[in-house]
Amino acid sequence: MAANEYDYIIVGAGSAGNVLASRLAEDADVTVLLLEAGGPDYRFDFRTQMPAALAYPLQGRRYNWAYETDPEPHMNNRRMECGRGKGLGGSSLINGMCYIRGNALDYDGWAAHAGLENWTYLDCLPYFRKAETRDIGANAYHGGDGPVHVTTSKPGNNPLFAAMVEAGVQAGFPRTDDLNGYQQEGFGPMDRTVTANGRRASTARGYLDRAKARPNLTIVTHAVTDRVLFSGKRAVGVSYLHHGNVLNAQARREVLVCSGAIASPQLLQRSGVGRSTWLRELDVPLVHDLPGVGENLQDHLEMYIQYECKEPVSLYPALQWWNQPAIGLEWMLNGTGIGASNQFEAGGFIRTRDDDPWPNIQYHFLPVAINYNGSNAIRMHGFQAHVGSMRSPSRGRVKLTSRDPNAHPGILFNYMADPLDWREFRDGIRITREIMRQPALDRYRGRELNPGAELTTDEQLDSFVRMRAETAFHPSCSCKMGYDDMAVVDNEGRVHGMQGLRVVDASIMPRITTGNLNAPTIMLAEKIADRIRGREALARVDTPYFVANGVASRKRESATV
């Protein structure tokens, strides 16, 4: 075999690409090339390794592509942040470390589409378990020996977590002890991708650490893939930039595009696979007219409902520079303390209406008042709920703007384009205010800081959303799986109309899942890895899961409104 020839070439060492690299390299008779545009995941860089420092990578460009959207027409024409991970681990290197799998009905919904029948929740659950090591042990829902370490919430954490969960229950919503178990719906503790010694459990740490010493796996960082190379309709390799040089690598079997929901459609389009009219605008030679590439883009939008805290128990002191050396030292030496947690240790999922079949609103509770990216910190003790709708009907697109591989694409999520979006965000604000008025928070709850208690009408709440809602950093669905005219890949990630080419990442989701996307992305990569290797899929299980079936979304007689 030539030095630049491999059986598989994987483009993107993120949440999916690292899974594929590790699993494919388990077969000693194949060779794998893993290309990553960013650098290593430096283990001594607290910005990516300390869970509490999660805002730092979003503030620079070493680990963040720092995309911006086109002006969003329903959001006061704001150009909105669209951070994506750069470096070994991809977005698992810079995300919030919330381990949320989604709702069982998300996957049953995928499987309701013709040709996707093998994507039910009970087909996917074995792969969630395969990927996971949960710190309190395995059960029917959780794994005990997978590459991704999952930490559960422990006694003695910030008292605001328990108070906010209890307030949700007092407002009439269910309590759940496991947001990834039998019943996602309700309020409860949140699992996190954090190791036993308080480090971020990215897919680089979980998967590549197991695989990188294998002689059949080659990892190249600072490698910006320009385009996929084709012979007719077959992918035969890639061209990439590395330290100023243009290099080609040949793929004997397949090219696997794992660059994420923004960069995967961009790479396909730059390579000549996409909507022909878009490609002609930039004189990109057409390889295959596939109009769904870059379409169907989805995300979660969220807002911060913030309150003053009357007792000095919030994390506000940890934001003061003079307290941070001690926090960092405890974390570095012992892997404990404030630094060892992402501080998203409680949350929930609710249905805002009884006729919603599964939760349409997600909560993350945070014992400090601050933006996700570390900006706009409130200079007092405070706490907040991150509140966002889960399955917006609004759809956007990713569109190539240049043949330059270093140029950013045009990104439009088209946030809040549907009347349902506005109804759900108004409901979310009003329900959150009910939760915050419950007795469990009486000793902590001060005045409402944002949106502000004076904002009550639909028009006032809508204005707040337009000005203040932000991305939850969950882009997806832009190379969707399926068999309709706008589908890009089949049920195993193979690009329609092509040979030797797959897309495997969050872009192939037909519809966004209910919650954070890291765990589902790892799962789908595990599942497709078996198919690439020619292995039988793990057997469908019969584990029970909750379905509301018209049950009331809350017990209103118990709530303080």
Swiss-Prot record:
Involved in the biosynthesis of the osmoprotectant glycine betaine. Catalyzes the oxidation of choline to betaine aldehyde and betaine aldehyde to glycine betaine at the same rate. FAD binds at residues 7-36. Its cofactor is FAD. Belongs to the GMC oxidoreductase family. Pfam families: GMC_oxred_C, GMC_oxred_N. The keyword Oxidoreductase applies. It catalyses: choline + A = betaine aldehyde + AH2; betaine aldehyde + NAD(+) + H2O = glycine betaine + NADH + 2 H(+). This is Oxygen-dependent choline dehydrogenase. SUPFAM superfamilies: FAD-linked reductases, C-terminal domain, FAD/NAD(P)-binding domain. Gene3D superfamilies: FAD/NAD(P)-binding domain, Glucose Oxidase, domain 3. Pathway: Amine and polyamine biosynthesis; betaine biosynthesis via choline pathway; betaine aldehyde from choline (cytochrome c reductase route): step 1/1. HAMAP family: Choline_dehydrogen (MF_00750). One of its GO terms (molecular function) is flavin adenine dinucleotide binding. Its EC number is 1.1.99.1, 1.2.1.8. It comes from the Bacteria. The active site is at H474 (proton acceptor). It comes from Paraburkholderia xenovorans (strain LB400).
